[in-house]
Every structure is written in C-alpha cells, then in structure tokens.
C-alpha cells in the first residue's frame, strides 16, 4: 500500500513518521519508555532526512563518510542500533556521488544479530533506474527488513515536479491512527499526507508515462543515460580528473569527479564551476558530507535531454576552462577566486532580495 506525495521529501516524512509511531506503539505495549527515538543514517543523506528527524523529535545517529567511502558502512550502521532505534535509512543513489548503499548487507546483518529494526529505502533517484538497468540488485521488498520505500516521479520517473511516492510492505507497517478516512468528497477515501490541497496533473503525468513508455521504454531511456554517463566519465578521466561515482549501472547516471591533487593545480573545483557557468553550464561544485568535507568535487546529473553531442560540448568547455585557469599565475588566481566569491555572495543576496521583494509585492497586490 502507498500514497502519492509532492515529492520524496514528503514521502520521507511520512515513512519516518510511520516508523516512529510503530516503534512507540510497540514500546508502550511492552511498558517501556517511548520518549527517546533515534534513527540511523549516513551523514550524506539529503537534508529532508535531517528535517524529518528534527521536526518529529528523533535523535540522529550517523555513520560518517570517510575519505574513500561515501556511503553508509553496514557494520557501523547496525552497531548503532539500540532499543530506541525506529529504523535505518538506506539510500539508493546518494546526492553526493549517486552511489547505491548496500541494503542487502544491512538486512542480512540485522537478521544475523537478531535485531528487530526496520529499513526504509530512500530510492528518490534510484527507484526508477535500478529496476531497468540493474534488475538483479536486491534492495527492495525482497529483503525481509525493508518495510517502506520512497521514490521521486520528477527525477528519473520522467515527470515534471512535483510528485513522489511512498509504499509500505504491508498495511501493518502503516499505523492506522495516521490514516484519516473521509466521505465528504463523493466517496469514502483514506488520506495520509502532510500537504493539503494539490493538483492531480503530476499523478496523471506519471500514469501517462507508465502507459506510453512501459518497461521497455524506461529500460531503453535509463540504459542510454547510463551509457552517456559512462562516456562522460571516460572523457573526464582522460582529462586527468578522478572519478568518484560508480559506472556501468552500479550507480545513478551521475558523474561525480574532482581534480587530482597530485597534479598540483593552483585552482580548485569552484573555479572550474564558475568558468563553466560563464559558458552556460550549471555544474555544481561542493564539499563532501561531514567528516570528509575537505574533499571538493563536482557533479553532472545526466538527464534524458543530455545527448552525446551535448556531452561532447561540455567536455570541450571543461577543456577550455582548464586552459584558461591553467594560464593564470598564483596571484592572478587568488584575485580571480576572490572575485568568484564576491560574485557568488552578490548573486545569493540578490536572489534572496528578489524573493523577499516578490513576496512583498504579492502581499501588496
């Protein structure tokens, strides 16, 4: 059973709330304290997980990334589980590198240690990729401990924002006190949402894509995206970058990469990102998750409209960016980076001011 959502953020909120309520019911029935729930997750989770934990008063217990591991450590995650743990979050396609976490290993360790702890799979991106590119990967309800899964329709589900989905293994994992039954809208309906009024166009769009593309269509598109991502990885590796994402269908159609520190460049990934922005490309540069934030990296998310010819154009512009930055001496580079930081701050404050002014204008109107 499941429900549609505005996106995976709402879906994750609902999944977390269901795990918390189920844990509380169990603790109350056993006559034990039920006021200090916690949840185990990787430090590279999307920010909506932190929001869910704080909004619902749940302690966050992290398995931190390292300099060479950017996903959850199954052994460490299971070791963090105690009697107050409502569940473990496993990510099928991390935000930082697009890598898949080992859901099966977490599941097997929980069973081996006899721990009654559910798993929620955050398949916001990977849920519409893995079944078509790597169908033999076991991450879903085939695993005993997986009780709920969320997926975004507006990512690789190929629908416009915002639509997401959350599904539960069976009705027992969705406490009925969270479900509201109403009959004043023509017929009896069950409702479990955090949002209220919303349109149905996104749901219709998802239904249309299912009918129009089918399994064969989705498989064709996802395989093509994977091939394009692998091609881009090869081109960037040839330019001297270190590729941090997984290729060959073992990760999302995402290319995460960084400069090789052994090459001794006097510029960083943020300078490259700014150069690319001047050429019309928005390729984000950012630092890795907590405890590994010294690592700077960039990320290209391969979408359906990112063809091989556009990929070649991006590679060409990256070459030009490297050439321009490489011709600057150290003093010129320091001045350039100060300029980039100043422009970034100005753009940020300008956007915030525009948003504020826009809201004020709306209020006045």
Predicted segments — roles?
Residues 1-32, 47-51:
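Conserved beta-loop-alpha segment that forms the PLP phosphate-binding cup at the N-terminus of a helix
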Residues 6-9, 32-108, 135-138, 144:
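PLP-dependent aminotransferase-class I/II
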Residues 15-17, 50-55, 99-102, 129-134, ...:
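Short acidic, glycine/serine/threonine-rich loops at helix termini
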Residues 17, 213-365:
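Non-catalytic terminal extensions of PLP-dependent enzymes
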Residues 22-34, 56-61, 69, 83-84, ...:
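Secondary-structure transition/capping motifs at alpha-helix termini
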Residues 99-134:
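Catalytic PLP-binding core of fold-type I/II PLP enzymes
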Residues 120, 128-253, 257-263:
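Active-site C-terminal subdomain of aminotransferase-like
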């Amino acid at each position: 059973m499941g429900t549609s959502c505005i996106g995976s953020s709402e879906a994750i909120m609902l999944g977390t709330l269901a795990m918390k309520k189920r844990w509380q019911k169990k603790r109350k029935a056993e006559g034990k304290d039920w006021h200090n729930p916690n949840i185990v997750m990787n430090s590279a989770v999307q920010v909506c997980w932190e929001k869910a934990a704080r909004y619902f008063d749940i302690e966050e217990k992290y398995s931190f990334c390292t300099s060479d591991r950017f996903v959850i450590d199954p052994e460490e995650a299971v070791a963090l589980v105690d009697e107050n743990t409502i569940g473990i979050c496993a990510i099928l396609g991390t935000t930082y590198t697009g890598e898949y976490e080992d859901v099966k290993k977490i599941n097997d360790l929980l069973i081996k240690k006899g721990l009654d702890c559910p798993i929620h799979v955050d398949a916001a991106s990977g849920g519409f990729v893995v079944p078509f590119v790597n169908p033999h990967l076991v991450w879903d309800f085939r695993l005993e401990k997986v009780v709920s899964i969320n997926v975004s329709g507006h990512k690789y589900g190929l629908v416009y924002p915002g639509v997401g989905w959350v599904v539960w293994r069976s009705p027992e994992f969705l406490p009925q006190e969270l479900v509201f039954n109403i009959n004043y809208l023509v017929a009896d309906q069950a409702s479990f949402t955090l949002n209220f009024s919303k349109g149905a166009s996104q749901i219709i769009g998802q239904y249309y894509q299912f009918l129009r593309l089918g399994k064969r269509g989705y498989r064709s598109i996802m395989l093509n995206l994977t091939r394009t991502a692998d091609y881009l990885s090869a081109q960037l590796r040839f330019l001297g970058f270190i590729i941090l994402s997984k290729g060959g269908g073992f990760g999302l159609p995402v290319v995460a990469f960084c400069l090789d520190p052994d090459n001794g460049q006097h510029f960083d990934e943020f300078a490259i990102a700014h150069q690319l922005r001047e050429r019309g490309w928005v390729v984000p540069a950012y630092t890795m998750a907590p405890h590994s934030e010294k690592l700077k990296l960039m990320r290209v998310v391969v979408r359906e409209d990112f063809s091989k010819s556009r990929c070649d154009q991006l590679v060409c512009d990256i070459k030009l960016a490297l050439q321009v930055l490489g011709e600057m001496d150290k003093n010129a580079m320091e001045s350039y980076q100060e300029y980039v930081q100043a422009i970034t701050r100005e753009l940020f404050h300008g956007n915030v001011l525009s948003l504020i002014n826009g809201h004020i204008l709306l209020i006045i109107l």
